[in-house]
A protein has these predicted regions:
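Single conserved hydrophobic/aromatic residue that forms the stacking wall/gate
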Residues: 1-8, 13
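Short catalytic-loop micro-motif centered on adjacent basic/acidic residues
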Residues: 9-10, 31-34, 61
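Rossmann-fold NAD(P)-binding glycine/threonine-rich loop
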Residues: 10, 14-30
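Short low-complexity, flexible loop/linker segments enriched in glycine and/or proline
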Residues: 19-25, 47-49, 158-159
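Short, surface-exposed connector motifs at secondary-structure boundaries
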Residues: 27-31, 257-260
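Active-site capping/gating segments
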Residues: 33-41
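Active-site-proximal alpha-helical scaffold in enzymes
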Residues: 42-54
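C-terminal catalytic/substrate-binding lobe primarily of soluble NAD(P)-dependent oxidoreductases
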Residues: 52-267
Length: 267
């Protein structure tokens, strides 16, 4: 079991990584944690907002919207096993120095995303909350929301009801299988979605805090077009927004633009 002693959550996954900080410092090497979009660019947005727009940030809502349509009744835009486990797990958010746990998909909000439109979004636990709670001074609450369409949720509920999202091994014809891994094998490969996906993604952070004694709120976000991403690199925008920041992070390490011995989150 992984606990997060630094911020008081049993849900955190960063402790085992942060524990290597001293070893990496002594070895003179750098580890960069979470260099995708979320986590990754969302951490950059947070550091940028604090540096340029706020004296202190009190609230962060991280929003991940995929407004794309791949034409399948049900498919996931990245590893189905990870995606389905993430959605079916209990949610959590950080508020006033401690973690608040929620039931899966319990908290729902609507948001009008620029260039995408109005979407339903649901609160999930996400790992960047763990580091931002430590690294953004003055923070009072951090939440993460991801959009899901009703068709996706209906299919997922049906699969859950018949046991197909279970990670508990079962015996089938003399062999042990994990239902969720079997489901992954029969679903469309996320890598195959690129040429058939249309629409846009919108991923960003709503920041509320103070500047010169006055409260202000801003939304810093990125929009990617699935079809344009496919033209450029041969993948849909979900893979694009994950892979391009990872490449940039690696490039900045290799060129010594980022050169600090130890283990660090991107913000």
């Amino acid at each position: 079991e992984i606990s997060c002693s630094l911020v008081g959550s049993e849900m955190c996954i960063r402790d085992r990584q942060w524990a290597y900080r001293e070893k990496f410092e002594k070895a003179g090497i750098t580890a960069l944690l979470g260099s995708g979009f979320d986590p990754g660019v969302t951490g950059v947005f947070s550091a940028y907002a604090l540096k340029h727009y706020f004296d202190e940030i009190n609230y962060i809502d991280i929003l991940d919207c995929n407004g794309g349509d791949h034409g399948y009744p049900f498919a996931t835009n990245f590893n189905p096993e990870i995606n389905i486990r993430e959605v079916s797990a209990k949610g959590s958010y950080w508020e006033d120095g401690h973690w608040v746990e929620t039931e899966p998909m319990e908290i729902k909000r609507e948001y009008d995303f620029p260039e995408v439109g109005m979407k339903d979004m649901y609160l999930l636990h996400h790992e960047e909350i763990e580091s931002l709670a430590l690294n953004i001074p003055g923070i009072k609450r951090i939440r993460f929301f991801m959009t899901f369409g009703q068709s996706y949720l209906t299919h997922l509920k049906c699969l859950e009801n018949v046991g197909m999202t279970s990670i508990k091994p079962i015996m089938y014809e003399g062999k042990e299988i994990v239902p969720l891994q079997f489901l992954k094998a029969v679903l469309p490969d996320p890598a195959s979605l690129g040429p058939r996906t249309k629409g846009k993604t919108n991923i960003g952070c709503i920041f509320t805090g103070k500047k010169d004694g006055k409260e202000k709120t801003i939304y810093i976000y990125n929009v990617c077009d699935h079809e344009e991403c496919y033209k450029e690199v041969g993948s849909q925008a979900v893979a694009y927004t994950t892979g391009v920041p990872a490449m940039i992070g690696a490039m900045m390490l290799m060129t010594k633009t980022w050169d600090k011995d130890g283990v660090y989150n991107i913000e």
